[in-house]
UniProtKB/Swiss-Prot annotation:
Family matches, as SMART domains: ZipA_C (SM00771)
Periplasmic side: 1
Primary site of residence: membrane
Cellular component, GO annotation: cell division site; plasma membrane
NCBIfam families named among the record's database cross-references: septum_zipA
Function (record text): Essential cell division protein that stabilizes the FtsZ protofilaments by cross-linking them and that serves as a cytoplasmic membrane anchor for the Z ring. Also required for the recruitment to the septal ring of downstream cell division proteins.
Protein name: Cell division protein ZipA
Length: 297
């Protein structure tokens, strides 16, 4: 049997294909389990930076999550808290006693608004700070004595900030009450509002707020129909243990009232309250503390 050219070509092709397949199978078998990669030696010689290798190769770590500060709800003023405070307030027993408190609180006011039909310019400010000091003496005698209330010496200086309404209708009772409750003031002695150390109405009195219109007090029983053209914030010296901090709180409360209820800030000289006036008040506090320290020596 003779093998022709055609048969030889077919046989050679089969042998070549078999060789290729065998070589490929051998390479695949020999390369199993080996990780083929090229190492860039320019990076392998670099020193570790800030523990970077530990961050990559080390075990996983649990990082502390950042917690936002939480606000204690007990520090926030609320209408419910003010309602409970009003329920605990002792009601006047006799009309004569209430009359005394009204007359005493009327003197603490910053001035008198004349709202008669003549529409004259209202006098909102007292002529001197001595009136406030004298009023403190009279109010302490008119108010009922309480063992829990600390007797304070007569005020030698009084820092006054008034807020006058720009609206002809004045400050409406419900809006005014909501605003000052948010600032931490609570209804108390002499039928006016006081800001204590605690927003809940506990601790020493930092400053007070009176009605600038006679009789100078607030009637919570008729607050829905109440309105006033102006109110006065006042801080007596000597008074709180930290008068500068108390004054800053008073300024913040007055500004909040003026901003939210469309009011205008005035000082005790019937002038617009400016940053210079506030700084002058602070200097008066520093000077008073210096004099008090000198007297103790």
């Amino acid at each position: 049997m003779e093998i022709g050219l055609r048969e030889w070509l077919i046989l050679i092709g089969i042998i070549v294909i078999a060789g290729i397949l065998f070589d490929g199978w051998r390479r695949m078998r020999g390369g199993k389990g080996k990780l083929k990669f090229r190492l860039d030696r320019s990076y392998s010689n670099l020193p570790d930076e800030e523990g970077g290798s530990a961050e990559v190769l080390g075990p996983s770590r649990v990082l502390d999550t950042h917690k936002e500060p939480e606000l204690d709800e007990s520090d926030l003023p609320s209408l419910s808290a003010s309602a409970r405070d009003r329920e605990r307030e002792p009601k006047p027993v006799k009309a004569s006693k209430r009359g005394k408190r009204v007359s005493a609180a009327a003197d603490v006011q910053q001035g008198d608004l004349n709202l008669s039909a003549e529409q004259r310019e209202p006098d909102l400010f007292a002529d001197s700070d001595d009136d406030f000091a004298a009023d403190n003496n009279r109010s302490s005698g008119a108010a009922p004595a309480s063992s829990s209330v600390k007797e304070l010496p007569p005020a030698e200086e009084v820092l006054v900030i008034s807020v006058i309404s720009r609206d002809e209708g004045g400050f409406k009772g419900p809006a005014l009450l909501q605003n000052i409750l948010e600032s931490g003031l609570r209804f108390g002695e002499m039928d006016i509002f006081h800001r204590h150390e605690s927003m809940a109405g506990h601790g020493e009195v930092l400053f007070s707020m009176a009605n600038a219109v006679k009789p100078g007090v607030f009637d919570l029983d008729d607050i829905d129909h109440f309105s006033t053209r102006a109110v006065s914030f006042f801080l007596g010296l000597p008074g709180p243990r930290h008068p500068k901090q108390a004054f800053d709180v008073m300024v913040a409360a007055a500004r909040k009232l003026a901003h939210e209820l469309n009011g205008e800030l005035k000082d005790d000289q019937r002038s617009v309250l400016t940053a210079q006036t506030i700084e002058h008040y602070r200097q008066r506090i520093v000077e008073f503390e210096r004099r008090a320290l000198t007297q103790k020596r």
